[in-house]
């Protein structure tokens, strides 16, 4: 039987190519589960550990040499757990079954492109339909679809009222947040486009300690008083609150900006971001730019000019984005998964310490 306080193990991918968004949203979900009576731990490679050190230092870990299926299995040898959460595009049904061994399983996904073995699937894409998973999951799989289930840290919903009440004024501050890993050095490229057009506007730039753009941006910030760097910041909610528009990535951070109604141009940096970006564009909730498009600099320039000069556009983007996500999704997802865990008998666990 499942104990009163279930142990839940997270497998979330991270690295220079995939970024840190998988781990970040899993940290948020893990904390929501912890607040509701679960004990959570992460299977941890060095890339995952680097994020946990900064953003989830209290979370226990099970070390793994890599997040390849065999190495995950080795890391789980002797570990006692009651349920698993997978946020890893490289794992599909066979891997989920082999690793979870009959335990309750939640899979966080954005692609709907492979078979999944899951009691619960969480896909926060705004255009996602149940039919997208009809051939990929079991009939009994519970689907948590749409931004209402997006795992967003609670500080964003706490600031929602204050943020929405200050939208609509002049542009005084701009935020650049293109992912902690700064894929391809895109942050430096965008900052250079912005600096040519800021005049008296301030610029807050968020990125990780290992971002390839960081050394160059440190030099620029030292001689440009308009610009402030925020490295591995814990204050993203406050930065979004105080900004008047953003140039951001089209990953899971889009929900943070939606909760606080921040007008944004979003850059599609990876194929898994295309669906959510297209859905936001269709709802006129963001300006969307694909980094693989021709004339990228010109497209960025046009978006900057529109956001700087068109107050009506900013107001429309703010209202449309705020209507998409309220920031309470982590709690909804945690409660749904705990209900599933409580309703199922677990297979006997291998002997070993709980994570």
Where are these regions (language model features)?
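A donor-sugar binding/catalytic signature common to diverse glycosyltransferases
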Residues: 20, 234-276
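A short acidic/histidine/glycine-rich donor-binding loop in glycosyltransferase catalytic cores
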Residues: 264, 282-294, 306
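C-terminal alpha-helical cap of glycosyltransferases
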Residues: 327-355
């Amino acid at each position: 039987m499942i104990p009163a306080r279930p142990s839940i193990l997270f497998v979330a991918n991270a690295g220079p190519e995939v970024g840190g968004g998988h781990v970040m949203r899993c940290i948020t979900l893990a904390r929501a589960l912890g607040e509701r009576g679960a004990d959570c731990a992460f299977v941890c490679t060095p890339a995952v550990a680097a994020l946990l050190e900064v953003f989830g230092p209290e979370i226990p870990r099970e070390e793994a040499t890599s997040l390849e299926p065999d190495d995950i299995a080795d890391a789980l040898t002797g570990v006692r757990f009651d349920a698993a959460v997978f946020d890893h595009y490289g794992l599909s049904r066979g891997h989920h079954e082999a690793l979870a061994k009959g335990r309750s399983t939640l899979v966080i996904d954005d692609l709907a492109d492979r078979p999944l073995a899951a009691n619960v699937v969480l896909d926060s894409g705004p255009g996602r339909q149940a039919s997208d998973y009809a051939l990929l999951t079991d009939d009994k799989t519970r689907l948590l679809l749409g931004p209402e289930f997006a795992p967003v840290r609670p500080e964003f919903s706490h600031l929602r009222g204050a943020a929405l009440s200050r939208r609509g004024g002049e542009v005084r501050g701009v935020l650049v947040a293109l992912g902690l890993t700064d894929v391809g050095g895109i942050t430096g490229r965008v900052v250079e486009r912005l600096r040519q057009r800021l005049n008296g506007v301030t610029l807050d730039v968020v990125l990780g300690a290992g971002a390839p753009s960081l050394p160059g941006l440190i030099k620029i910030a030292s001689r440009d008083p308009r610009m402030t760097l925020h490295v591995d910041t814990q204050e993203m909610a406050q930065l979004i609150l105080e900004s008047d528009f953003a140039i951001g990535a089209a990953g899971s951070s889009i929900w943070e900006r939606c909760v606080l109604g921040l007008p944004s141009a979003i850059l599609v940096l990876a194929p898994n971001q295309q669906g959510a970006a297209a859905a936001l564009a269709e709802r006129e909730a963001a300006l969307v730019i694909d980094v693989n498009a021709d004339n990228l600099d010109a497209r960025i320039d046009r978006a900057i000019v529109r956001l700087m000069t068109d107050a009506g556009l900013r107001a429309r983007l703010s209202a449309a984005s705020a209507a998409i996500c309220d920031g309470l999704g982590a709690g909804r997802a945690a409660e749904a998964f705990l209900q599933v865990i409580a309703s199922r008998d677990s297979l006997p666990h291998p002997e070993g310490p709980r994570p």
